[in-house]
Amino acid sequence: MKTLAKFILITAALLLSTPSIAQSDVSDVSEELKIAAVEALIAAPADKALPLVTKVLEGNHSNEVKERALFILSQIDQPEAQSTLLKVARENQNDLGLEAVRMIGISGNDESLASLASIYENGNSEAREAVLEAYMIAGDKQSVFNIALTAEGDDFDEAIEMLSVMGARDELRELRGKTGVSEALIQAYAISGDFESLRELALDGSDVELQTQAIEAMGIVGGEQVDSTLVEIYRSATAEDVREAALHGMLISGHDAGVLELYRSSQDPSEKKQLLEFLVMTGSDEVWNIIDSTLTGDQ
């Protein structure tokens, strides 16, 4: 094992110090070898790999080679590795700096993750997005929640979208009490699969626009509870917008059986026409029998 580690270190040192060659084919081979050399450092002892990785980052190498070096740093459990990642993240307003931010997320180091807050506050939109990605990778819901509390506009939307991807239902519910209901929050409830929050909003008629958005978003969650609730909402609704939203929700969830049930129980020709149109959109096999029966006068 010591022989293998020694071979890796010698190979890496030689390849990473190789000068660039003019010929494109030879240059490509050299680049691939440098990448392989850096990746090989994953098996090297930390005290041996760290100096070589640092040398790569300080040298005249391509971003692709340096990005591999950043990953190796993320796997080295030493303070020096974390400080180097933070240094690259803070000092490079480019793809390399953004990659360093994401690598901090992969490392999962609590102190480094906490330091990303200042990069978020002072960085551009790409830097802020990279910080959110790092928190997602690390599973740090609290940090994303803290950002959402004070963020506005697109930054707020991106933060709650990230929370939804992380399945942070409790945090999203808490945000409702602090920031109010918005279309972005409704979509976040849908992505996180929060049926209860959506159902509560879907049954609240104080704001019809938000209500209809919540009803349609329930279709994204899907499942038996959603399907039965959408049918119930349709039957009890008096507003046309709400009824149509319920149909859209069933269309999204693929609940053609519910639309078929409503069609068969309806006695209103105008309503049956609309329901038939939705049945066609759902792709229900039964719709062709209904059309055939209608054309032959059986319905």
Predicted regions and their residues:
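Core register positions within helices of long alpha-helical scaffolds
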Residues: 40-43, 72, 103, 134, ...
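Amphipathic alpha-helical scaffolding segments comprising HEAT/armadillo-like alpha-solenoid repeats
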Residues: 22-27, 46-58, 78-90, 98, ...
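Positions within the helices of HEAT/ARM-like alpha-solenoid repeats
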Residues: 33-34, 64-66, 95-97, 126-128, ...
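Bacterial N-terminal signal peptides that target proteins for export
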Residues: 1-8
